[in-house]
């Protein structure tokens, strides 16, 4: 079973991944955002035109590696989706920050990497895609609250809003696997125990519905859920 959490910047996807990991007792493949793991990210925020294509190729390679490693662990949660990386590349292209040639190369590479091949021991689409829907106000508040210095430039505000719109449009049309959307403005699943219970219950219900969580595993998870509140 592979679960992917795909959500806008500042939505709480890493926090939700950690909660799910504890509940399902599965490892998480986190998005590389630290200076040590991803030295390109702060450079990108200082010069999107220079580093935009390079950053997206870095993420594409990392996400594909996560998919393969997730298969090896049998059950896993992936924090951030390879499918949504194209949202960032497309936004850069719309904003004139990457060239038509870079745009075409990226999408040709992505399509080639993500083509499902008959007989391959793993599939590339997740069993469940989880989205978190938040408002622009919530997004900007949380970006400011978490305090990553390279994200705080006021000139990035419109960029964040555009990405949020792009993400919502993408998630609405996503149909490669079952999906579930969490209303992130309505539930504080990080600090409120009841909200945490509700959100995790929604996810467990969906996993049961699609047949990836059954039998004794399902009973064990339901018992752990009841202990939250």
Task: Specify the residue positions occupied by each region the protein language model found.
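Conserved lysine of the Walker
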Residues: 13
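Hydrophobic positions on the alpha1 helix immediately C-terminal to the Walker A/P-loop
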Residues: 16, 20
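Conserved substrate/cofactor phosphate-moiety recognition/catalytic segment
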Residues: 22-62, 88-89
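Hydrophobic anchor at the beta1->P-loop junction of P-loop NTPases
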Residues: 5
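P-loop (Walker A) phosphate-binding loop of NTP-binding proteins
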Residues: 8
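NTP-dependent small-molecule kinase module
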Residues: 144-229
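A glycine- and Lys/Arg-enriched "phosphate-lid" helix/loop adjacent to the NTP-binding pocket
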Residues: 88-165
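Pre-Walker A (Motif I) flank of P-loop NTPase domains
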Residues: 1-2
């Amino acid at each position: 079973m592979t679960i992917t959490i795909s959500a806008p910047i500042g939505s709480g996807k890493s926090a939700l991944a950690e909660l799910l990991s504890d509940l399902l007792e599965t490892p998480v493949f986190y998005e590389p955002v630290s200076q040590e793991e991803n030295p390109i990210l702060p450079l990108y925020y200082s010069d999107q035109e220079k580093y935009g294509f390079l950053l997206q190729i870095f993420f594409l390679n990392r996400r594909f590696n996560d998919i393969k490693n997730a298969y090896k662990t049998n059950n896993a949660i992936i924090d951030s989706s390879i499918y949504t990386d194209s949202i960032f590349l497309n936004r850069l292209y719309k904003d004139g920050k990457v060239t038509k040639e870079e745009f075409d190369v990226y999408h040709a590479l992505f399509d080639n990497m993500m083509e499902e091949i008959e007989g391959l021991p793993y599939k590339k689409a997740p069993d469940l895609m989880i989205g978190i829907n938040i408002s622009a106000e919530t997004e900007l508040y949380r970006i400011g609250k978490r305090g990553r210095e390279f994200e705080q430039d006021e000139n990035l505000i419109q960029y964040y809003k555009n990405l949020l719109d792009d993400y919502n449009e993408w998630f609405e049309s996503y149909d490669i696997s079952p999906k579930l959307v969490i209303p992130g403005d309505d539930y504080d699943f990080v600090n409120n125990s009841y909200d945490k219970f509700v959100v995790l219950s929604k996810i467990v219900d969906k996993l049961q519905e699609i047949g990836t969580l059954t039998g004794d595993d399902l009973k064990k998870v339901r018992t752990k859920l009841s202990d939250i509140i």
